[in-house]
Amino acid sequence: MAARAVFLALSAQLLQARLMKEESPVVSWRLEPEDGTALCFIF
């Protein structure tokens, strides 16, 4: 359950990453709407 809480917390940063994705192409993210908590960050 703790991991799920972390994913939910990262969802807020995910929105910011989407706005800065054009400025930071090195940061790629993927969100799976099926679960809503599956986030994959690649730095």
From Swiss-Prot:
<feature type="signal peptide">
    <location>
        <begin position="1"/>
        <end position="17"/>
    </location>
</feature>
<keyword id="KW-0964">Secreted</keyword>
<protein>
    <recommendedName>
        <fullName>B melanoma antigen 1</fullName>
    </recommendedName>
</protein>
<comment type="function">
    <text>Unknown. Antigen recognized on a melanoma by autologous cytolytic T-lymphocytes.</text>
</comment>
<dbReference type="InterPro" id="IPR012530">
    <property type="entry name" value="BAGE-like"/>
</dbReference>
<dbReference type="GO" id="GO:0005576">
    <property type="term" value="C:extracellular region"/>
</dbReference>
<dbReference type="Pfam" id="PF08180">
    <property type="entry name" value="BAGE"/>
</dbReference>
<comment type="similarity">
    <text>Belongs to the BAGE family.</text>
</comment>
<keyword id="KW-0732">Signal</keyword>
